[in-house]
Amino acid sequence: MESKDQGAKNLNMENDHQKKEEKEEKPQDTIKREPVVAPTFEAGKNCAPRGGRRRFRVRQPIAHYRWDLMHRVGEPQGRMREENVQRFGEDMRQLMEKLRERQLSHSLRAVSTDPPHHDHHDEFCLMP
């Protein structure tokens, strides 16, 4: 009789132990299955900015800003811009021509046999 009572107690203890394990496993499974959601910060709810976050929002660049400025011809400001662009283009052409002339003159002087015209800064002479 005592052996039957001990066997019943052992079964009850094993069942209780299994139930406890199942209860412990269930919360872990639910934790594993839930997706991790980042906390959202709303302004005005006593949220202080964290160290890694920027305090001010950076302004995004306007796409095609230069193209937009160059092609606004309908308004009077746009016409002025177009005139400025044309004038700027002419100035650039003149500067490029001057630069080309100077580069050619230096390269031609190195090739030509004519004596230099009072430019002694680039000459080097070892004769006494």
From Swiss-Prot:
Q: List the disulfide bonds.
A: none
Question: Where does this protein chiefly localize?
Answer: nucleus
Which portions of the chain have biased composition (kind: Basic and acidic residues)?
14-35, 115-128
Q: Where is this region: His cluster?
A: 117-121
Q: What is the effect of changing residue 45 to E?
A: Does not affect subcellular location
Keywords per UniProt: Cytoplasm, Developmental protein, Differentiation, Metal-binding, Neurogenesis, Nucleus, Phosphoprotein, Ubl conjugation, Zinc
Residue ranges of the region described as Disordered: 1-55, 107-128
- Summary of the tissues where the protein is detected: Expressed in the central nervous system. Expressed in Schwann cells from newborn sciatic nerve.
- Annotated phenotype, changing residue 19 to E: Does not affect subcellular location
Query: Which residues are listed for Zn(2+) binding in this entry?
Result: 125
Oligomer status and interactors? Interacts with neurotrophin receptor p75NTR/NGFR. Interacts with OMP.
- Domain comment in the entry: The histidine cluster (His cluster) and Cys-125 mediate zinc-binding.
Q: Function of this protein?
A: Signaling adapter molecule involved in p75NTR/NGFR signaling. Plays a role in cell cycle progression and neuronal differentiation. Inhibits neuronal differentiation in response to nerve growth factor (NGF). May act as a link between the cell cycle and neurotrophic factor signaling, possibly by functioning as an upstream modulator of receptor signaling, coordinating biological responses to external signals with internal cellular states.
Name the UniProt record assigns to this protein: Protein BEX1
Please name the taxonomic classification of the source.
Eukaryota, Metazoa, Chordata, Craniata, Vertebrata
Q: Gene name, please?
A: Bex1
